[in-house]
């Protein structure tokens, strides 16, 4: 790494630390020529995930949008932000592991529903009502009956 102070092309790493789920590395460096110290960060660049919308359009995957929809479903529920962030990261890493760069919205929605079902049934119903485009009270009754049947197994 080039020194930003004297432009020496070789610097020494004094300390390295992983942060943000080991996706970012912070390095403390020192220049042997001018003895200046500076910090660099290295971030793992992942491939660009695309989302195939229901209308056929393509959109860049947005982790914040995923988080926002889950936060809406879990609002005022006893679900910690740590668990929500872990869920978002797990879904993201699972999507990253798929061979396709373009993922249909229904695949992402199904992953969210599967995770919410395990985490909080009320949040699951809330998310399902939007994701599955509930039209009337019978749609709610059907999903609640499904939850009751799953719990009785």
Swiss-Prot record:
<dbReference type="GO" id="GO:0005524">
    <property type="term" value="F:ATP binding"/>
</dbReference>
<dbReference type="GO" id="GO:0003677">
    <property type="term" value="F:DNA binding"/>
</dbReference>
<comment type="function">
    <text>Negatively regulates transcription of bacterial ribonucleotide reductase nrd genes and operons by binding to NrdR-boxes.</text>
</comment>
<keyword id="KW-0547">Nucleotide-binding</keyword>
<feature type="zinc finger region">
    <location>
        <begin position="3"/>
        <end position="34"/>
    </location>
</feature>
<dbReference type="GO" id="GO:0008270">
    <property type="term" value="F:zinc ion binding"/>
</dbReference>
<keyword id="KW-0805">Transcription regulation</keyword>
<dbReference type="InterPro" id="IPR055173">
    <property type="entry name" value="NrdR-like_N"/>
</dbReference>
<comment type="similarity">
    <text>Belongs to the NrdR family.</text>
</comment>
<dbReference type="Pfam" id="PF22811">
    <property type="entry name" value="Zn_ribbon_NrdR"/>
</dbReference>
<keyword id="KW-0678">Repressor</keyword>
<keyword id="KW-0863">Zinc-finger</keyword>
<keyword id="KW-0804">Transcription</keyword>
<keyword id="KW-0862">Zinc</keyword>
<dbReference type="Pfam" id="PF03477">
    <property type="entry name" value="ATP-cone"/>
</dbReference>
<dbReference type="InterPro" id="IPR003796">
    <property type="entry name" value="RNR_NrdR-like"/>
</dbReference>
<dbReference type="InterPro" id="IPR005144">
    <property type="entry name" value="ATP-cone_dom"/>
</dbReference>
<keyword id="KW-0238">DNA-binding</keyword>
<dbReference type="GO" id="GO:0045892">
    <property type="term" value="P:negative regulation of DNA-templated transcription"/>
</dbReference>
<protein>
    <recommendedName>
        <fullName>Transcriptional repressor NrdR</fullName>
    </recommendedName>
</protein>
<keyword id="KW-0479">Metal-binding</keyword>
<keyword id="KW-0067">ATP-binding</keyword>
<feature type="domain" description="ATP-cone">
    <location>
        <begin position="49"/>
        <end position="139"/>
    </location>
</feature>
